[in-house]
Regions:
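Active-site flanking loop/helix segments enriched in acidic
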Residues: 2-23, 58-71
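Divalent metal-dependent catalytic cores for phosphoryl transfer on phosphate-bearing substrates
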Residues: 40-148, 152-153
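Charged phosphate-binding loop/patch that engages nucleotide di/tri-phosphates or the phosphate backbone
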Residues: 159-181
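N-terminal-biased segments
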Residues: 15-43
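Alpha-helix C-capping/helix-to-loop hinge sites
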Residues: 9-16, 34, 140-143
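Amphipathic alpha-helical segments within well-ordered protein domains
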Residues: 7, 28, 32-35, 82-87, ...
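Alpha-helical scaffold segments in carbohydrate-active enzymes
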Residues: 30-33, 139, 176
Length: 181
């Protein structure tokens, strides 16, 4: 299913399509690997596979030339743009929620208002186990260095720009999915 949606929106932009697919495949693989280690969490792996491949579908609408994005929206809106796209495709709401709730370690209403972010004024934190898993896995891969997996320390540092309790939310996800032994 994800392939048809990507094919529809990513025509004539081979470099961006490559970035999207490579990044999304890395996120998907990590999420599925983690899910396989946690049968007790009853993670819907079929949904995770599809949703992880679509979580960044909205980058086509943002202005981020460094990663071949030549849209008009600010980059921070790629999640809500993706959610709008998936809703317009008639996908179940849970796919759209993954898109809009994976930025940072999720964004609270306070984060959005206090930082004056150009986002809807409501809580955008991941809630379901699948939303949390995809959000967590995404933090280990950037779209600028497709060949590198971040360490936990690098992932944590990349969250500093989101402020608030972002780091604490990420650590909670880490303890859920990859607890220290």
């Amino acid at each position: 299913m994800y392939k048809q949606i990507i094919d529809k929106y990513y025509v004539g932009c081979d470099a961006l399509r490559h970035i999207l697919l490579t990044h999304s495949q890395s996120v998907t693989q990590r999420a599925l690997q983690i899910a396989s280690l946690h049968p007790e969490l009853h993670i819907d792996v079929d949904f995770v596979e599809q949703a992880a491949m679509l979580h960044d579908i909205g980058i086509i609408r943002v202005d981020a030339p460094g990663i071949e994005c030549y849209g008009t929206e600010p980059y921070i809106r790629h999640g809500v743009c993706g959610a709008e796209m998936l809703r317009s495709e008639g996908l179940p709401e849970r796919y759209a929620r993954v898109c809009e709730r994976h930025t940072g370690a999720g964004l609270t209403l306070d984060d959005i208002v206090s930082q004056d972010l150009p986002l809807p004024h409501h809580d955008l934190q991941p809630e379901t186990i699948e939303e949390k898993l995809i959000c967590y896995a995404d933090k280990f891969y950037s779209k600028t260095h497709l060949d590198r997996e971040k360490t936990i320390e690098q992932a944590e540092r990349s969250l500093a720009k989101f402020g608030g309790d972002t780091w604490a939310r990420f650590r909670m996800m880490k303890e859920l999915f990859e607890p220290e032994k």
